[in-house]
């Protein structure tokens, strides 16, 4: 666990300075330096530890652990599993990302209702999310593994095509699509660099750096959360957790990151 708590205090202390920093190349450099400084003691480790405990603990009406959950590489295999997700699962006859697969395992193995399994998908500062902890634990087991999301099954190809369509679909009060904010290099909103997600390098870096511990929120955030929040920025209706649309969009982004080593849980401002 190293000095996570001390690092957390440091991060909080650094935050106001960051908010006041002027936009410009200097800011980007500062944020990068600050990321580097925190990289050896990411508070995400606290979520990982809690997630490991949740994975192993007997829970739900059936009082069994998740250790027999098949994330795609065989029952209980966690190492490298995230680097090949989303993918098609024959037992559910659909494409699933990590979260929808975990919900599936909570329902089938542990006997939870869907409502219980999807309760509080994202933490809110005072109440932590079990789902985000599980995601932190499992994704950490793919650190360094090269992304290799499959397009073998017809439903995997369908999900990719649907995700691509959603990415370029314009609508809402501002007539925005994801591409409006994410298809040009060098764009920035306030202090934040906007990755060009249609360009391989940016797409790889963006996808492989989630989940991330968000210093500004004191929370670990998953890719499902990232997409939920970008739907909000786009003034679209709320993206339903583990919905077909969220999985398809994840498939599009994850597949476009193929070839890059997975590098999360990361740390972000
Ligand atoms: C109104 C502009 C806007 C729209 C539209 C938008 N985003 Fe974003 N997106 C952002 C901003 C701003 C950030 C950076 C947020 C931050 O750093 O806090 C971001 C970050 C991201 C990231 C993480 C990048 C990284 O390197 O960490 C991903 C992935 C992403 N958006 C995907 C999407 C997808 C998919 C859509 C369409 C559903 C979308 N965005 C729509 C503004 C937008």
Regions found by a protein language model. Give the residues of each.
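Bacterial N-terminal signal peptides
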Residues: 6-16
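Short, charged low-complexity linear segments at domain edges
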Residues: 36-52, 144-164
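Hydrophobic, well-structured mid-protein blocks that either form specific transmembrane helices
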Residues: 134-141, 150-151
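Positively charged n-region of N-terminal signal peptides that target proteins for export
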Residues: 1-4
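Sec/Tat signal peptide C-region and signal peptidase I cleavage site
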Residues: 17-21
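Electron-transfer interface patches adjacent to heme c in soluble/periplasmic c-type cytochromes
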Residues: 22-46, 56-133, 143-144, 169-269
């Amino acid at each position: 666990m190293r000095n996570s708590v001390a690092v957390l205090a440091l991060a909080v202390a650094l935050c106001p300075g960051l908010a006041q920093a002027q936009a410009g190349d200097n800011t980007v450099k500062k944020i990068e330096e600050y990321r580097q400084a925190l990289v050896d003691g990411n508070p995400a480790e606290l979520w990982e530890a809690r997630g490991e405990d949740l994975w192993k603990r007997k829970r739900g009406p059936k009082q069994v652990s998740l250790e027999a959950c098949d994330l795609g590489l065989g029952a209980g295999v966690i190492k490298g599993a995230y680097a090949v997700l989303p993918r098609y699962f024959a037992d559910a006859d659909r494409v699933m990302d990590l979260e929808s697969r975990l919900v599936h395992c909570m329902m089938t193995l542990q006997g939870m209702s869907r409502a219980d399994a999807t309760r509080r998908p994202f933490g809110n500062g005072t109440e932590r999310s079990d789902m985000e902890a599980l995601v932190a634990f499992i994704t950490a087991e793919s650190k360094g593994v090269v992304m290799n999301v499959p397009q073998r099954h017809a439903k995997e190809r369908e999900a990719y095509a649907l995700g691509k369509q959603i990415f370029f679909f314009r609508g809402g009060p501002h007539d925005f699509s994801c591409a409006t904010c994410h298809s040009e290099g060098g764009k920035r909103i306030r202090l934040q660099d906007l990755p060009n997600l249609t360009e391989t390098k940016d797409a790889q870096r963006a996808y492989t750096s989630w989940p991330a511990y968000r210093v500004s929120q004191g929370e670990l955030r998953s890719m499902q959360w990232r997409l939920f929040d970008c739907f909000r920025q786009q003034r679209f209706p709320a993206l339903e957790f583990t919905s077909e649309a969220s999985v398809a969009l994840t498939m599009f982004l994850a597949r476009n990151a193929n070839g890059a080593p997975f590098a999360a849980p990361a740390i972000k401002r």
